[in-house]
Amino acid sequence: MPKRDAPWRSMAGTSKVSRNANYSPRSGIGPRINKAAEWVNRPMYRKPRIYRTLRTPDVPRGCEGPCKVQSFEQRHDILHTGKVMCISDVTRGNGITHRVGKRFCVKSVYILGKIWMDENIKLKNHTNSVMFWLVRDRRPYGTPMDFGQVFNMFDNEPSTATVKNDLRDRYQVMHRFYGKVTGGQYASNEHAIVRRFWKVNNHVVYNHQEAGKYENHTENALLLYMACTHASNPVYATLKIRIYFYDSILN
């Protein structure tokens, strides 16, 4: 015997809502709104006062827009003895990739690329780890110091590298990471993807020269040190390094 229709079905302008369209997770259609999502995405006026007073500004303090960008694209031959490159080289000018005056702030650093081995090396059974150090040089002078001049190592092993005691005030390691490649006929991994994004807020100061060189820095140069653990087998890094910076209002 069929069930009797509910009295509201006969009312004008009403219809039965299908259970398949109730936005349940099993149906797979439509957004599913719950109290947790509403609380996370609540408007700013419903958040505590500390969220409103201590918000991180898009533009660093003491700087002005627009956000500018400088890219460094290069293939590096990474050695066991280490390598260094300056990533705060910005030429003075009026473009979106230039600095207006002597001072600017590097808000963030984006490193992407890959570590790889050539055809001859990847057939050998070995593991090679490549380490990167993002270092701030507070008092740059002359040319960048080599890896062995800045870092103290045990048995000349880069994996044990720490900044020398007498240079800890000048060189500050802001971030470090590593990538690993493996060679051999079986289970080899001949390349590794590199992708890092850091917020640094590093205030760089140049002298009166216009060229973007390390020798023209006077304060807070950004250096990227690289070294590999294997002494005989070389490894390469194809990197694109982008810095996002703002000009200082003191220029």
From Swiss-Prot:
A motif (Bipartite nuclear localization signal) lies at residues 3-20, 195-242. A motif (Nuclear localization signal) lies at residues 35-49. InterPro entries: Gem_coat_AR1, GV_A/BR1_coat, Viral_coat. Keywords: Capsid protein, DNA-binding, Host nucleus, Host-virus interaction, Metal-binding, T=1 icosahedral capsid protein, Viral penetration into host nucleus, Virion, Virus entry into host cell, Zinc, Zinc-finger. It is found in: Virion; Host nucleus. GO terms for cellular component: host cell; host cell nucleus; T=1 icosahedral viral capsid. A motif (Nuclear export signal) lies at residues 96-117. Residues 12-25 have a biased composition (Polar residues). Residues 1-29 are annotated as: Disordered. GO terms for biological process: symbiont entry into host cell; viral penetration into host nucleus. GO terms for molecular function: DNA binding; structural molecule activity; zinc ion binding. Pfam families: Gemini_coat. A zinc finger (unnamed) spans 63-80. Encapsidates the viral DNA into characteristic twinned ('geminate') particles. Binds the genomic viral ssDNA and shuttles it into and out of the cell nucleus. The CP of bipartite geminiviruses is not required for cell-to-cell or systemic movement. Homomultimer. Binds to single-stranded and double-stranded viral DNA. Interacts (via nuclear localization signals) with host importin alpha-1a. Belongs to the geminiviridae capsid protein family. This is Capsid protein. It comes from Potato yellow mosaic virus (isolate Venezuela). The lineage of its organism: Viruses, Monodnaviria, Shotokuvirae, Cressdnaviricota, Repensiviricetes.
